[in-house]
Amino acid sequence: TIDNNQEVTNAFTNNGTITNLNNNNGGTLNDVTNSSTGTITTLTNRGTLNGTLTNENGGTIQTIENHDNIQRIDNQQGGTIDTLNNEVNGSITTFDNSGSVTNDFTNKGDITTLHNHNTGTMNNLTNATNATITTLTNDGQLTGGITNETNAQIDDIINTATLGTITNNGTITNNISNRTNATITTIANAQGATIGGVINETNATITTFDNSGLVQNNFTNQGIITTLNNNETGRLENLTNASNATITTLTNKGTLTGGITNQVNGNINTIDNQANLAKIDNSGTIGSLDNKNNAKIDRIDNQAGAEITDVSNEAGAEITTFENSGSVTNNFTNNGEIGSLTNFAQGTLNNLTNSGTGHIGTLTNEGQLNGGITNEAQTQGSPDGGKIDKIINKNTLSKIDNSGTITEIDNETNASITDLTNQSEGVIDNLKNQTDGTIDSISNQGHIKDGTNDGHIKGFVNAKPNAQ
């Protein structure tokens, strides 16, 4: 046992074995080296350790307990520290690990810079309640991951290699940055916890991001995220999936204030919205977009050149505005509420169905609407069937098949409708065919209450000539 209560002025080097090295209150050590042949069972610091505590290649320190101030710890490649604890009121300015920290590392004090270098191996790193780490960088293997406890603070986490799980119950002030080609298995942001921002760089991977807390600033994915969950208590501000980035499944059950932006060549396989979502601005590819019961999306913009495979707005769900200048490849099914749906000149829709529970305020077609519009008959709980307040056609429309209620159909100048069928349950309040508008065929088995024709109607079959 070595007890130091004063100052050791020069450097201290251990080439042998020390069972207990105690730097006590009032003690000062300057540059301590545990050499390649050295072993220290327990090093306890309650004083000041200036310079660097170096554990060289082949050296072993079984336990480091710090209660006061260590300027720098350098665990070199091939060096082993079994257990490292920075206790309450303990301060480590810099910890550089290029070797192995075998057991869990717990920080209960303050660490300014913690750097796990490319040859470094760490298991579980815990930043305990009321503890602080300014910058945490992992270039090696941090297999068990990082836990930031309640009221604990980490300013920045930077990962360039392999990191297991980041569990945040406290505050990560600035960013979690997952750098190019790096991997994080899971990020879990708990209820009441805060992360400033998240950056997943090109070719970087986050397998699961699970948010029940707050991400204050931008969340930018430039790489790959397999599963992204914004849970009931979760709040995200702006979520951007950048060019050539991929999100496999994105589920929103919480608050996504700034909405989702999917940039050119970005890919989101599935968006499952179960809560309030400000917007979806798509310039890339979205596979399935599903707005669930009682959920609301304020605005969806599918830009020119962008693609959405399937859109489903479920019963009880609401989309305030949907504007399409790109392509919706397969079915577009509305079982809920859509305030305004516009298919612009560059846009393509295929098979637009407003079901028996659906309501669309204004539906405007200026582009291609292949497969036409189907407004379905009543279903249980929907005595009037599907309802569309107004259809405005400014281009070519293959069909309108109505078994519900349409307040007005306006086929504008130079526009055309191939087949308009009003089924036995169908009600059309007003049909307008403007100058040089063309309707090839009208088949009415229901009720068309009023209409004006200033264009061309080539065929009209009225199965209910006395319908009111």
Residues covered by each model-derived region:
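Extracellular beta-strand-rich, repetitive "passenger/adhesive" scaffolds
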Residues: 1-468
